[in-house]
Amino acid sequence: YSLNFVEPWLGGRQPVQFSFSISQTKQFRYDYFTRKADKSQFFEIRGLTIGMARRLSIPDDYFQLSQAIAYQYYKLNNYYTGLFTFGDGESHNLSYNISLLRNNTYTNPIFPTGGSSFTISARLSPPYSLITGDDFSDVEERSEYTNYKGEPIQSEIDQAKYRWLEFYKLKFNGSWYT
């Protein structure tokens, strides 16, 4: 399920858009012998996003700046599909999203006959390893992630690495209509 709320004009003379979104999804493994979903094996995602956007008057009136804080929680329970490097555990994703948009398409917003639209955006997570001082380059040699033979336990290593997701994404998109 998901629940979304958007307030396009949050008071004042200048329009400030406020948005809120909450979602949850749960996927179960399929048991080919019983031809039913196996409820003991699942992958669950819960998410929450709060954002604000406003029009800018500099350099012209076609610019818009939007920002959002997003959190996602991933839980895997006996979900060994090869899609992830671990099948049991959880992961957290906290990110800050910012985008700058210039949109001056005209005539029809679905099928524009003129104008242009350009977007540059970034999605950033906090640098957890820098904050906590964790260095995962030598995690395979650490005693807490090895078995009694001294061999690395890959599922525990991956769970430690991906407990808090750390990344950045930069995107640019442009369209020109004539």
Predicted regions and their residues:
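Gram-negative/organellar outer-membrane beta-barrel architecture
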Residues: 1-111, 117
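Extended beta-strand-rich architecture
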Residues: 95-178
